[in-house]
């Protein structure tokens, strides 16, 4: 908008139905696996922000078997293993940064692990959050974002 804030539109039910039908048709026609259904921001996080955090990825996964989504129980299992008092310090160290950069790369994000926080890393985390944690997309690898990432890697190891 004119103030420099990002504004993301809501997707109404009619749009979601049309998106699902179109994506299903294209995926079937070209034999695209459901796990390869991605958004611009997943592919080019430093340049693209669409479809944004309000895009209904979870609904497309649950209702139409499109895309990827994590299992809540698996996420919770990873989350309960985290020690809150040390997590932030661990993840802000070079080893921690390298660890989560590598995890994002394992899931398919085009990030080169360096052990340093840079704009590319922040934008990649933000894109990941748009897709899998749309309630909070600040580009910070916090405990919940890490738990979701681990749950996805466990569910989709060959991604």
What are these regions (language model features)?
Residues 1-38:
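Long, well-ordered alpha-helical scaffolding segments within enzyme catalytic domains
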Residues 23, 57, 101:
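Generic structural marker for isolated residues within well-ordered, non-membrane alpha-helices
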Residues 29-41, 113-116, 137-140:
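Surface-exposed patches in mature extracellular/periplasmic domains of secreted proteins
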Residues 53-80:
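Acidic, His- and aromatic-enriched active-site or binding-groove loops in soluble protein domains
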Residues 81-85:
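C-terminal accessory nucleic-acid interaction domains of nucleic acid-metabolism proteins
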Residues 86-158:
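Short acidic, glycine/serine/threonine-rich helix-capping segments at coil-helix boundaries
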């Amino acid at each position: 908008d004119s103030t420099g804030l990002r504004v993301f539109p809501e997707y109404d039910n009619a749009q979601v139905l049309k998106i699902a039908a179109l994506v299903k048709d294209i995926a079937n026609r070209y034999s695209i696996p459901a796990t390869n259904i991605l958004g611009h921001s997943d592919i080019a996080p430093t340049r693209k922000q669409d479809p944004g955090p309000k895009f209904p990825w979870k609904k497309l996964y649950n209702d139409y078997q499109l895309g990827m989504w994590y299992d809540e129980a698996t996420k919770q299992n990873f989350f309960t293993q985290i020690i809150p008092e040390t997590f932030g310090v661990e993840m802000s160290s070079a080893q921690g940064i390298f660890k989560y950069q590598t995890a994002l790369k394992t899931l398919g994000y085009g990030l080169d692990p360096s052990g340093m926080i840079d704009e590319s890393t922040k934008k990649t985390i933000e894109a990941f959050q748009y897709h899998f944690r749309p309630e909070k997309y600040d580009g910070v690898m916090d405990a919940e974002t890490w738990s979701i990432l681990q749950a996805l890697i466990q569910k989709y190891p060959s991604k």
